[in-house]
């Protein structure tokens, strides 16, 4: 019979300071402080994954010693997260959120909002551009010297058309809203009209996105992820690092487990 494996997770909504969690990881996994911190910025509140019963007990005991709320769940019991409904338009007040999904309008109660999770995800695209390059000063000087020496009118060089690869870096802002009935709505700031902000709507999608987040914070008692707290607390960078959307979803899973534990 295969031995059970466990996931250890922080069971409170807001993560403790990472340096506190790092002390647990240092002792449990025999890591130096830097290694523990590097692990934590990509673990999204999980302190152990697929660990055996003895390691589970060790990590939970260390958390208890440091007054860190933590719990475990077996690999087999991990819940599945619902597929996202990506929306481009919505309207809401303190009671109801109405959104459009495939030309159909759906409404859902704000009081049933359980998880709010935000992540800034950097994307890098490469495109080819045509550019005209003029002869540089060295080339011009050499050709001028040849003309003076030989009296042959070879000119100072011609413009050249070259094709170069240019890297473009962009940041996409994602916001997931998870409700009691498992509905998971996703907003991409670059593809959302923000008309729900009415007179507060600005030209900048980043400003609009932040205003939307603040309004949701005021309307809801939902659990919020680390990056959402960073945003509303005015931090310039996020505590955790999000390379792709699956990182955000991993943190959402941790919040779902914590919410279930504390319900």
Positions of PLM-derived features:
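Phosphoinositide-dependent membrane-docking surfaces
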Residues: 93-99, 105-129
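Anionic N-terminal interaction surfaces
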Residues: 49-90
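Surface-exposed aromatic
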Residues: 40-47
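Mixed-charge, low-complexity intrinsically disordered segments
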Residues: 123-164
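Extended, charged low-complexity segments
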Residues: 151-263
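Long, compositionally biased, phosphorylation-prone intrinsically disordered terminal regions
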Residues: 78-85, 120-125, 224, 228-240
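C-terminal alpha-helical interaction appendages
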Residues: 1-27, 54-60, 64
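Small-residue helix-packing motif on alpha-helices
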Residues: 32-36, 56
């Amino acid at each position: 019979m295969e031995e059970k494996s466990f996931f250890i997770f922080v069971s409170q909504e807001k993560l403790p300071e990472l340096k506190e969690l790092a002390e647990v990881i240092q002792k449990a996994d025999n890591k130096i402080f830097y290694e523990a911190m590097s692990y934590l910025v990509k673990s999204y509140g999980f302190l152990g994954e697929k660990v055996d019963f003895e390691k589970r007990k060790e990590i939970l005991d260390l958390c208890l010693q440091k007054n860190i709320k933590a719990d475990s769940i077996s690999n087999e019991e991990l819940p599945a997260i619902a597929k996202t409904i990506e929306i481009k338009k919505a309207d809401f007040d303190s009671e109801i959120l109405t959104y459009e999904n495939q030309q159909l309008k759906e409404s859902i109660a704000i009081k049933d909002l359980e998880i709010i999770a935000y992540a800034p995800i950097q994307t890098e695209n490469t495109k080819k551009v045509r550019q005209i390059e003029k002869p540089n000063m060295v080339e011009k000087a050499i050709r001028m010297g040849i003309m003076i020496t030989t009296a042959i009118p070879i000119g100072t060089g011609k413009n050249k058309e070259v094709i170069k690869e240019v890297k473009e870096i962009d940041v996409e802002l994602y916001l997931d809203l998870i409700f009691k009935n498992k509905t998971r709505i996703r907003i991409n700031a670059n593809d959302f009209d923000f008309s729900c902000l009415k007179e507060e709507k600005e030209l900048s999608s980043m400003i609009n996105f932040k205003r939307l987040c603040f309004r949701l914070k005021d309307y809801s008692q939902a659990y919020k992820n680390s990056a959402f707290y960073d945003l509303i607390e005015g931090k310039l960078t996020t505590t955790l690092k999000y390379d792709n959307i699956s990182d955000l979803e991993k943190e959402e899973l941790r919040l779902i487990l914590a919410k279930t534990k504390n319900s």
